[in-house]
């Protein structure tokens, strides 16, 4: 994808989510499944990486659902997104919740170029399937991590089951999320994500499935990664 096409694609994604920002914190609105998934995402991160007093960056933070949860676990949280309305919603909600979170309107690539002090943990949830270059996002995430730091990614697998459940079912039949939220061709299989991550200097530690039940509006971690999944990577430590 050339730079002009990539920019256009990213702009379209930003506009798509900006238009939904006012619904972000409504657990019955357009982000209803995300609210159900969030406790399991937080549990996965907290079980695999100590959070208290550690510097954490949430990339593609949206309205701040994950960022706030991680801040409540004691992490010093910074969070970035390219959607202006989402950042404003996140800042307002954090203020109302009396949480200290540093929200910035930046991409991971922009933030990495500004050379901040490296983070202990970087989270990138439900984002990589929306960016024009997953490889570039992973490379930026590595630059933002200290050696030995943890990266957590959640996304949707590219399988027939994920197409039927996460796209046809969730977007068109049950209308849990807006139509057009996901493009099947842009989804990554775990092996593809692991290969890109390895090229960026990351080691795969774990892949776990994240199952959502739309009828009970509940989620659980599972060994089945055929639809939603979480992946834990670690930045390779520098040689002594």
Predicted features and spans:
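N-terminal, positively charged/glycine-rich alpha-helical extensions of SAM-dependent methyltransferases
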Residues: 1-25
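A short glycine-rich, Lys/Arg-flanked "PGG" loop and its adjoining helix->strand segment in the class I
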Residues: 135-147
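Acceptor-substrate binding/catalytic loop of class I
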Residues: 175-192
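Conserved class I S-adenosyl-L-methionine
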Residues: 54-60, 152-174
């Amino acid at each position: 994808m050339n730079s002009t096409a990539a920019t256009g694609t990213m702009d379209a994604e930003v506009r798509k989510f900006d238009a939904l920002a006012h619904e972000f914190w409504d657990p019955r609105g357009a982000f209803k499944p995300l609210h159900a998934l969030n406790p399991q995402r937080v549990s996965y991160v907290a079980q695999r990486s100590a959070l208290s007093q550690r510097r954490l960056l949430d990339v593609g933070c949206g309205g701040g659902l994950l960022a706030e949860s991680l801040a409540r676990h004691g992490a010093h949280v910074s969070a970035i997104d390219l959607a202006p309305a989402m950042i404003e919603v996140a800042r307002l909600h954090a203020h109302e919740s009396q949480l200290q979170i540093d929200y910035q309107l930046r991409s991971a690539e922009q933030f990495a170029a500004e050379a901040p002090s490296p983070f202990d943990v970087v989270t990138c949830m439900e984002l990589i399937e929306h960016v024009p270059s997953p490889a570039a996002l992973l490379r930026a995430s590595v630059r933002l991590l200290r050696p030995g730091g943890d990266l957590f990614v959640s996304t949707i697998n590219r399988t027939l089951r994920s197409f039927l459940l996460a796209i046809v079912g969730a977007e068109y039949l049950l209308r849990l999320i807006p139509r057009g939220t996901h493009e099947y061709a842009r989804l990554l299989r775990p092996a593809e994500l692991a290969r890109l991550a390895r090229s960026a200097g990351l080691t795969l530690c774990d892949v776990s499935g994240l199952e959502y039940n739309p009828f009970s509006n509940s989620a659980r971690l599972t060994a089945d990664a055929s639809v939603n999944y979480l992946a834990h990577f670690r930045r390779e430590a520098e040689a002594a």
